[in-house]
Amino acid sequence: MRPYFFFPLVFAISAQEIPTTLKDQQSLAVTIYNSNLALIKDQREVKLPKGLCQLAFQEVSAQIIPETAILRNLTSPKDFWIAEQNFDFDLLTPEKLLEKYVGEAVEVISVKPRANGEGQTEIRERATVLATNSGAVLQFADRIETSIPGRIVFPKVPGNLRARPTLVMNLNSGADRAQKLELSYLTGGLFWKADYAANLSADEKAMDISGWVTLTNQSGAAYPNAVLQLVAGDVNIVVPQPAPEARKMAFDGLATVSGAAPQMREENLFEYHLYTLDRPTTLKENQTKQVALLSAANVPVRKEYLLRGQSYYYSGSYGDLGDKLKIGVFVGFDNKESASLGKPLPKGVVRVYKEDSKGGAQFVGEDSIDHTPKNEAVRLKLGDAFDVTARRKQTSFKKLPASGKNNNVYESAYEIEIKNAKNEAVTVTVLEPMPGDWEILEKSHGFVKETSRTAKFLVNVPAAGSSVLKYRVKVMW
C-alpha cells in the first residue's frame, strides 16, 4: 500500500515538470450548457518519463472548476495514477512580477545625458524592492526611491507565476513514451443563447424562420478546432457559476436572416436536447460568434388582436375605465412537422420582420420563448396596434346582499367600444379576468369560459368602423 501522505515530499524533491501546451493537442470537444457552464475534453499527446513527474497542463480555462478536473491516460493506463493536482492562476504580469520580488534584489537601468551633452549613457544600479503597495518602494545603496527611475531587470521568473492558467498534476507514469492524455473539466465563462429571425409573408399568414446560436467565450482560454455541442434544457447546478461581467467582445461570423446554412444535428440527451455542429469551429478568447441552428420555410401563422381587462373592475364603481386603450398584436404558430417545423426550440428571442412596399425587410417586433418541445404552440407579442383602439366604461354597478357562503356579491355592466381605422376588418379577442364565482347575465356577443376565472369574447370590427361589446355580470366571493 502506497503511503499517500509522503507524495508531496517526494515530488517536491525529485519530480520533473513536463509542460504541455496547445501544440500537443490532438482533439478538443466543448459542450456548452445554458447556465454559463461548459464541459471541456482536451486530448493531448505528451512524452512522459517512467515514474514520478509533474505535468503542467497549460492553457486551460481561467475559470476552470478545479475539483471537476479528471485526467485519463488513453495509451498506457497501467501504473498511471495521480497523487495531487493544483490549479495555478497567479498569472505573470509586470505588477505581479514586481510583487514577487519584495525583499529581493533587482537591477534598475536608467538613462542620463552625457556630461559633454553628446548622447546618453546607461546607469545600472542594484536595488532592493521594499514594498509594492500603491506603488513601488526601492532601496538603493544611498537612497530610497518611491518611483521607478528606469526599467527593472529581473534575474528570473518566480516558479509560482505562470504565463497562462495551468493545471499542475503530480503523477506517476508506468511507461517512458509519448502518451495520449485526456483532461476533462467543467468551466464557467462559456455560454450560449438561441436567437430566431422570422420573415412574415405579405399577407401575414405564413413566415420563414431561421434559428441562430450565439456563443460567447469569456473563459480566459481559446478553443481551436473544437467539436462543438450545445445542451438545451435546465440542468440543475448545486452552486451556480456567476455570470461574467460585460466587456468589449470580438464578433466573428455574425449571421444575416437570409440564405440557408447547414443546421445543427439534434438528439435527445437524458431530459434535455443536444445539438452538434457539423464541423469543428474555433472559439477565440473574448469572442462572440453565431452558427446556424435551424431553418424552416412557409410556416403557417395566426395573427391575433388582444384586449385584456383587470379583475379589480368588478369590485367597485369606476365609471370610465380608459380611452384609446392599447390592443396587443400577437402572432402564433404550431411547432409541428405538418406546419414545416416540428423541432425542439431552445429558449431565446424571436425577432420578426416584414417587407415594406419596396421590398426592404423592416423589424416589426420581438418576444422571448422558453424551451419549446415539438408539437407545442408558440405565441409572440410583437407590440400594440396603432389603428385598432378601444374605450372601456362601466355603465352600472351595485352591491347585492350576501348569498350563502359569499359575503361579496356585485352586479355590474360594461361597454367596450373597439375602433378600427384599417382598410380591412379585424377580429379582436377580449379577455375579461373575473374574480370568484361569476355569471354573465346579459351579453351582446357570444363568449366562452376559457378558464374558471376568464371570459373570452371575439369581436368582429369592420374596416374603418367600430363595434361595441356589452355585457352584464354578477360576481360572488
Predicted feature residues:
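Long, intrinsically disordered, low-complexity accessory segments associated with secretion
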Residues: 3, 13-477
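Sec-dependent signal peptide recognition
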Residues: 1-8
